[in-house]
């Protein structure tokens, strides 16, 4: 897939980040992960992100990364494109991006670097080195310590033809407007705030109609229905689902830092697609919280 092909894929439809399956000892469960992807692939997502934030990229080590990407690529070949996550220190991000390309992934989402602060010149150097280390398309993730100005993105766009996507996880309306006005159709734009459905209509108004859905991991039918409501400006359906599911869901998710991933694995377990526990430092939902989540899921009906 060429960078332009990746940009085209990222420009429409719903995206999602499958959770990564671990066994009871916390080791990668390739069989379970393949079964998960086989279940999710037919629901119609434009692309799936392997080893992304929801896939606990931050906890992976050693050979696990390659095993996860290979399992995803092999399982979804001919069904749905696979975009690999890569991040952390520049050399780690480069190594993972190159491995993902070698294994047949269709592009890479460049996740934030770790721990240290960096100015715009440093961020530009980081992204440029990763982009120039691979031939396939790169999407940069704007969040946490990795926050780009419109001017920095313009420099990167000129230097890196294979940088084709911008995913926003900050939600700063003024900055997003400035980026969109400056860069126009040079990038595909993705909404990437946690529980993106809550912000989907606002992002669409900014020129960013595409977003990644975490709840697709356990309520894929509802996730696709919500995306269709956003696409067609069906506000009645959006408001109904926001009121009945997403807003009470947020109350559970926001109780503990890190629950943004934990609640997704909990949901998958409740619908019969258990992905195992989250890895430390994340913690799983408490039994009472599982019951709360189950009640919300049950109201939605079969998926």
From Swiss-Prot:
- Asked if the keyword Repeat belongs to this entry, the reply reads no
Its recorded reaction(s) are:
5-dehydro-4-deoxy-D-glucarate + H(+) = 2,5-dioxopentanoate + CO2 + H2O
Q: Which Gene3D superfamilies match?
A: Aldolase class I
GO terms, biological process: D-glucarate catabolic process
Q: Top enzyme class of this protein? A: lyase
Provide this UniProt record's keywords sorted from A to Z. Answer: Lyase
- Metabolic or biological pathway, per its Swiss-Prot or TrEMBL entry: Carbohydrate acid metabolism; D-glucarate degradation; 2,5-dioxopentanoate from D-glucarate: step 2/2
Query: Which residues are listed as membrane-spanning?
Result: none
InterPro entries reported for this sequence: Aldolase_TIM, DapA-like, Dehydro-deoxyglucarate_dehyd
User: What Gene Ontology terms describe what this protein does at the molecular function level?
Assistant: 4-hydroxy-tetrahydrodipicolinate synthase activity; 5-dehydro-4-deoxyglucarate dehydratase activity
Q: What is its EC number?
A: 4.2.1.41
Q: Which residues form the signal peptide?
A: none
Similarity annotation: Belongs to the DapA family.
Q: Which HAMAP family match?
A: KDGDH (MF_00694)
**By what name is this protein known?**
Probable 5-dehydro-4-deoxyglucarate dehydratase
Instruction: Give the organism, scientific name.
Output: Delftia acidovorans (strain DSM 14801 / SPH-1)
């Amino acid at each position: 897939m060429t960078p332009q092909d990746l940009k085209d894929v990222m420009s429409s439809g719903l995206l999602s980040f499958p959770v990564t399956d671990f066994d009871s000892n916390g080791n990668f469960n390739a069989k379970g992960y393949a079964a998960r992807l086989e279940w999710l692939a037919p629901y119609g997502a434009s692309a799936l992100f392997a080893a992304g934030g929801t896939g606990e990229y931050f906890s992976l080590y050693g050979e696990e990364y390659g095993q996860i990407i290979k399992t995803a690529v092999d399982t979804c070949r001919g069904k749905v494109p696979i975009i690999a996550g890569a991040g952390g220190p520049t050399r780690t991000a480069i190594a993972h991006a190159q491995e993902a390309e070698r294994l047949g992934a269709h592009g890479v989402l460049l996740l934030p670097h770790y721990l240290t602060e960096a100015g715009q010149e440093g961020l530009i150097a980081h992204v440029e080195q990763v982009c120039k280390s691979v031939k396939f398309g790169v999407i940069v993730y704007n969040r946490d310590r990795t926050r780009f100005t419109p001017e920095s993105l313009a420099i990167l766009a000129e230097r890196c033809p294979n940088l084709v996507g911008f995913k926003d996880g900050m939600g700063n309306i003024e900055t997003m407007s400035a980026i969109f006005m400056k860069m126009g159709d040079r990038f595909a734009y993705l909404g990437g705030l946690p529980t993106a459905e809550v912000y989907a209509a606002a992002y669409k108004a900014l020129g960013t109609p595409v977003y990644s859905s975490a709840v697709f991991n356990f309520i894929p039918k509802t996730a696709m229905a919500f995306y269709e409501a956003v696409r067609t400006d069906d506000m009645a359906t959006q408001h109904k689902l926001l009121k009945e599911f997403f807003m009470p869901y947020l109350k559970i998710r926001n109780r503990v830092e890190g629950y943004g991933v934990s609640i997704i694995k909990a949901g998958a377990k409740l619908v019969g697609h258990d992905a195992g526990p989250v890895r430390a430092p994340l913690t799983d939902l408490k039994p009472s919280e599982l019951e709360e989540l189950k009640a919300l899921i049950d109201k939605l009906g079969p998926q």
